[in-house]
């Protein structure tokens, strides 16, 4: 299964394409979409949307895994990230790409074995699990790969739940 992991943001959207086959996962492509600071917020969202659409069309993932919004103390930041998530989900919907969403706690649990693992531990585990020579940078890229690895772990269970519920 080809999974496009996404870490939403307004300045940087991390992404990583992970292949999960026969219990093995490997990173195929990872990078980020950047939007210029100070640019009109609507232009930034348009840049994110266009970038995600281009990735979906070029990489042909089978599914997208997106980190859910974690509300912090800065509501302005949370709102902006929520808008970025919206255009990311819209790009997936326009291309018919299925989307799975995971909380930061679920991602950390799947990757590091502990839902409250520090960011550094999650990054080291992403590096180890995907056999990367270096930790992916910036952090947003490592987070996107972590979301994809999380989905690779959860996808079989989610499919089984659907099958059981459909009976």
Swiss-Prot record:
Q: A Gene Ontology MF term for this entry?
A: DNA binding
Q: Please, which domain of life does this record's source organism belong to? A: Bacteria
Which InterPro entries does UniProt cross-reference here? RNaseH-like_sf, RNaseH_sf, X-over_junc_endoDNase_Mg_BS, X-over_junc_endoDNase_RuvC
CDD domains noted in UniProt: RuvC (cd16962)
Reaction equation(s) it catalyzes: Endonucleolytic cleavage at a junction such as a reciprocal single-stranded crossover between two homologous DNA duplexes (Holliday junction)
EC number(s) from the headed UniProt entry: 3.1.21.10
Arranged from A to Z, the UniProt key words for this protein are: Cytoplasm, DNA damage, DNA recombination, DNA repair, DNA-binding, Endonuclease, Hydrolase, Magnesium, Metal-binding, Nuclease
Q: Which top EC class is named for this enzyme in its record?
A: hydrolase
The main location is cytoplasm
Q: Which SUPFAM superfamilies match?
A: Ribonuclease H-like
Give the residues the record marks as binding Mg(2+) 2. Answer: 67
- Which biological processes are named by the entry's GO terms? DNA recombination; DNA repair
Q: Which GO terms describe its cellular component?
A: cytoplasm; Holliday junction resolvase complex
> Required co-factor?
Mg(2+)
Q: Where in the cell is it found?
A: Cytoplasm
Q: Where in the sequence is the active site? A: 7, 67, 140
* Binding site residues for Mg(2+) 1: 7, 140
Free-text comment on the cofactor: Binds 2 Mg(2+) ion per subunit.
> What do we know about how this protein assembles, alone or with others?
Homodimer which binds Holliday junction (HJ) DNA. The HJ becomes 2-fold symmetrical on binding to RuvC with unstacked arms; it has a different conformation from HJ DNA in complex with RuvA. In the full resolvosome a probable DNA-RuvA(4)-RuvB(12)-RuvC(2) complex forms which resolves the HJ.
Role, per record: The RuvA-RuvB-RuvC complex processes Holliday junction (HJ) DNA during genetic recombination and DNA repair. Endonuclease that resolves HJ intermediates. Cleaves cruciform DNA by making single-stranded nicks across the HJ at symmetrical positions within the homologous arms, yielding a 5'-phosphate and a 3'-hydroxyl group; requires a central core of homology in the junction. The consensus cleavage sequence is 5'-(A/T)TT(C/G)-3'. Cleavage occurs on the 3'-side of the TT dinucleotide at the point of strand exchange.
- Family designation: Belongs to the RuvC family.
Protein name per Swiss-Prot or TrEMBL:
Crossover junction endodeoxyribonuclease RuvC
Q: Which gene encodes it?
A: ruvC
């Amino acid at each position: 299964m080809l999974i496009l992991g996404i870490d939403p943001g307004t300045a940087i959207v991390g992404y990583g394409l992970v292949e999960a086959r026969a219990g093995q996962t490997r990173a195929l492509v990872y990078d980020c979409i950047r939007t210029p600071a100070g640019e009109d917020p609507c232009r930034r969202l348009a840049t994110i949307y266009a970038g995600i659409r281009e990735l979906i069309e070029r990489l042909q993932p089978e599914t997208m895994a997106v980190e859910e919004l974690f509300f912090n103390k800065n509501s302005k930041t949370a709102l902006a990230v929520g808008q970025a998530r919206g255009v990311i989900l819209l790009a997936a919907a326009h291309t018919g790409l299925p989307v799975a969403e995971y909380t930061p706690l679920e991602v950390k649990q799947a990757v590091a074995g502990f839902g409250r693992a520090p960011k550094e531990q999650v990054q080291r585990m992403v590096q180890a699990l995907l056999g990367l020579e270096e930790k992916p940078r910036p952090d947003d890229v490592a987070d996107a790969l972590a979301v994809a690895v999380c989905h690779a772990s959860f996808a079989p269970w989610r499919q089984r739940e659907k099958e059981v519920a459909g009976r």
